[in-house]
Amino acid sequence: MVSQCQIRVVRSGGSKLDYRRSVFSADGKYLICVSGDFIKVYSTSTEECIHALQGHRKLVTGIELNPKNHLQLYSCSLDGTIKLWDFTDGILIKTFLIGCKFLSLYTSATDDLVFAVTLKNNDSASSQLVSVKLPKSASQECEAKEISVIIEDVSHLPKCTAIGRQCLYVASVKGVHLSIYYFKTKKSFRFSLKATSKKGANNIFTVVACHPSEDCIATGHMDGRIRLWRNFNHKKEYTYTSLHWHHDSVMDLAFSAQGTKLLSGGVESVLVQWPYGSEEKKEFLPRLGAAIEHISVSPHGTLYCTSHTDNKISIIDTSLKVSGIIQGLLKGTVVKTGLIVDPRSNALVLNGKPGHLQFYSLLNDRHLYNLDIVQQEFIHQAGLQYMDLVKASFSSTGRWLATVEELQGGEDSMDLEMQMKLWEYQDKSQSFVLNTTINRPHEDHITSLCFRDEGNSEKEAPTLVTTGKDGLFKVWMLNNNYDIYKQSSSWLCDFVGGYHKNQATNCCFSEDGSLLAVSFDEIITVWESSTWDLKQTFCQPPGKIRNLCFGRMSCSKYLVASTNNGFICCWNLLTCALEWRAQLDATVLQPDPLSENIAVVSCSKRWSNLFLFQPSEPRPFYTQKNICQEKVQWAVFVPKEIPEFVKSESHQWLNKSQLYFLTEKQDLLTFSSKSTEERLTPLSKQLAVEESLPVTPFHLLLGKKRQEEQEKLDAQSVRAAPSFHRGYQNSAIREVLHTPAHVLPPASVLCTVFVNSLLISKKSQSTEESKEDEEMKSEHSEADSSDETEEMESQKRFPSAFSLDVAAMLPKFQEKELRRIRRTDYSWISSL
């Protein structure tokens, strides 16, 4: 029976960090950026995500600091709201309901006004600049109805509008026009440039920035020029100076906090710093990795940050040195490798920069590293062909990685330039090292590749199978006796197979690795992996095989396949008969490696639907429709580090693995049965006590040993001074030492409690000590006067300080034995 449960589709991260300009906190400790419908707060010193502010229902389009409170942040969204946040604690303070779609946001320090670019009548073709009066209300939600139009026709890009010094004017560019509006006088000025010139100039505006303390406006243009405008409060007496270094369009401009420097960036991946007033002495920060999309400056002027088209943010100090990098999930044009999981790190692996594989942590929503596969310099220029990564696969243990790279644009098989590389993971270097390079492994494009499960047997050589459009599948095995010294290994072709010269499209191994299934157009062939003999063929209904997989665990006797004409078929390998067939157009067929479950995603009427089933049963045990409004391209099950145990039967398929899927717009989504509060715990709650601070990698290495040593020292200190140790752990002392000073009561109030907590209680004596004291008292009472006289004489012969030291150093039982020895009569010795 299909279950209906509250499993929601949630964004797993990977949203664009370069969608809007980032914002520094007033002290420069935090960097705030837009990430889809989230707002993320990062630490500039550690690059760790401190908070993920969630409250908007749609894409966040603008963020700005509250000029009247530097600990608060304004944000706007396409959901028609403006929200006020306390970003240091991750708390939503207030929501202003406006009802129009916002594209960007600007704040004013003079009045309770914010400026925003909105769509005219929700029409995406035109936009306007408006001012919104934010009402003062005690309620958490309130409506803002006072909206005034300032400029009718503006660009929808936030970088094309800027607020002037002291909020005296606003400048906006669109096309070849520069518009300036003064708020107090309500006068507007409009300047125009010719679109082109005889020298080949392209004067279309791309960005505008205003000087923080002078009447100067900087504009960037398509031809790479920068113009500095002055005297723009006169229509005929205005002037501008031109700066030119960029060979392509200027993508962003920003003045420093004091206005002494102008920063510019473009597709050259170079940050240019122009000294204001002496622009010929410009400085450069090259090789930033990707085109610069946005530039931000901290309020105190000590930090810059650049947002790049590869979804990366670089934090830069004033000496033009990169001090930190925040890398998000890199989104390319097409994800050809699909979604892969690294068995070692449990990281998501897919196409990254051209010719690279990116490893991405799904747990922390953070980029780990890039693996350069092609190992060629990438030149950003239109029309150039370059080697592109098209296929990748890991072995079951993660020791081996196979990649296939092809020359971009090479469609003709005769001119095809292709390489397959085998990479081995080295424990010493903790990285993949190239082991074998195979030029042109097939005569045509490779369609799929997969490793055989290595299992626990070390005798079996690692095996890789590739299929190609040349109608062949090839078996590659690791040869450990490659050289005469038998000290190196390499991959060699061990077997070549085919079926009636049909194109080989898919391949997969059974769970135990004994069988190999290869699809040739509309036919599936099953081969024995020990001898590579053809054992069985299965014919599908008319339609080419799109996906192919074996069942796992209790369903390992089944083989499941989907076709491009809308069928899913399941065969029983024991009877070699069709077990069942269902009519469903499956774009994705993904098995769970830790269970018998198989996920199917189909697309109908622009909506994608999810079905989960087991091969032994044709009816799905879970269905969720309308998971997204786009076509799902790839999906993958990622094993959970800590399995969950949920009683609900409808949630049990999420116990061991998490299903992630990638849409056409490259949004990474997943399924969760937890609420938003459970998934996103504010870091302020996690850091409420000292023990819950996140550990560092250094602490993971040495923390256990130090913890054991500390426990030993604590045990010794408890035996030496139990009362003081208990006093230090007293809540009164902890309150004084750990409570922030600005919230503590006066010292006179805490003095009595604090001093009393340090006193040694008489009741702290143990029962054994009290018994020993009673025995000592009884022995003292039984001692005669002669013994007391001898003790007094012995005390006179030895200094009192020495006796105190001895008494203090001796334990109770030794002191008791010493007193008995002193009472012994040794007078008989004198008679000898």
From Swiss-Prot:
PROSITE patterns: WD_REPEATS_1, WD_REPEATS_2, WD_REPEATS_REGION
Domain of life: Eukaryota
Cell compartments where the protein resides: Nucleus, Nucleolus
Residue ranges of WD repeats: 4-43, 47-86, 90-131, 145-184, 193-230, 236-275, 278-317, 323-361, 375-424, 431-477, 490-528, 532-572, 577-614
Keyword annotations: Nucleus, Repeat, Ribosome biogenesis, rRNA processing, Transcription, Transcription regulation, WD repeat
Pfam families linked: Beta-prop_WDR75_1st, Beta-prop_WDR75_2nd
Key word rRNA processing present: yes
One GO CC annotation: nucleolus
SMART domains per the UniProt record, alphabetical: WD40
Chain intervals for the UniProt region annotation (Disordered): 764-798
One of the record's GO molecular function terms: RNA binding
Any one of the GO BP annotations: positive regulation of transcription by RNA polymerase I
Function, as annotated: Ribosome biogenesis factor. Part of the small subunit (SSU) processome, first precursor of the small eukaryotic ribosomal subunit. During the assembly of the SSU processome in the nucleolus, many ribosome biogenesis factors, an RNA chaperone and ribosomal proteins associate with the nascent pre-rRNA and work in concert to generate RNA folding, modifications, rearrangements and cleavage as well as targeted degradation of pre-ribosomal RNA by the RNA exosome. Involved in nucleolar processing of pre-18S ribosomal RNA. Required for optimal pre-ribosomal RNA transcription by RNA polymerase I.
UniProt subunit comment: Component of the proposed t-UTP subcomplex of the ribosomal small subunit (SSU) processome. SSU processome is composed of more than 70 proteins and the RNA chaperone small nucleolar RNA (snoRNA) U3.
PANTHER family: WD REPEAT-CONTAINING PROTEIN 75
Name under which the protein is recorded: WD repeat-containing protein 75
Organism whose genome encodes this protein: Xenopus laevis
